[in-house]
């Protein structure tokens, strides 16, 4: 009986979720990505100042 009650509550919660069409959401996602691409390290790459993988420059005296 407890199982059925939990399933019913889960189904009610899922029924109340607001759904949108994929065509609308994909347009919003593209707009968001275009708007924020300058701050996205995966799109723009790290700057020289904030690149933890850049080789450290050292001075060697000969």
Curated annotation (Swiss-Prot):
Bilayer topology term: Lipid-anchor
Tissue specificity remark: Predominantly expressed in the central nervous system.
Positions carrying Cysteine methyl ester: 59
Start-end of Basic and acidic residues biased regions: 53-62
UniProt xrefs under Pfam families: G-gamma
Entry protein name: Guanine nucleotide-binding protein subunit gamma
Homology family: Belongs to the G protein gamma family.
Organism: Caenorhabditis elegans
MF (Gene Ontology): G-protein beta-subunit binding
Matching PANTHER family: GUANINE NUCLEOTIDE-BINDING PROTEIN GAMMA SUBUNIT
Keywords: Cell membrane, Lipoprotein, Membrane, Methylation, Prenylation, Transducer
Main location: membrane
Stretch list, region Disordered: 40-62
Localization: Cell membrane
Function of the protein: Guanine nucleotide-binding proteins (G proteins) are involved as a modulator or transducer in various transmembrane signaling systems. The beta and gamma chains are required for the GTPase activity, for replacement of GDP by GTP, and for G protein-effector interaction.
A single Gene Ontology CC term: heterotrimeric G-protein complex
Domain of life of the organism encoding this protein: Eukaryota
Pro-piece positions: 60-62
Gene this protein is translated from: gpc-1
GO biological process: G protein-coupled receptor signaling pathway; sensory perception of taste
């Amino acid at each position: 009986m407890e199982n059925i009650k939990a399933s019913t509550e889960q189904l009610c919660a899922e029924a109340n979720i607001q759904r949108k069409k994929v065509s609308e959401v994909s347009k919003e996602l593209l707009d968001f990505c275009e708007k924020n691409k300058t701050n996205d390290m995966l799109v723009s790459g790290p700057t020289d100042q904030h690149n933890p993988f850049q080789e450290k420059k050292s001075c060697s005296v000969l």
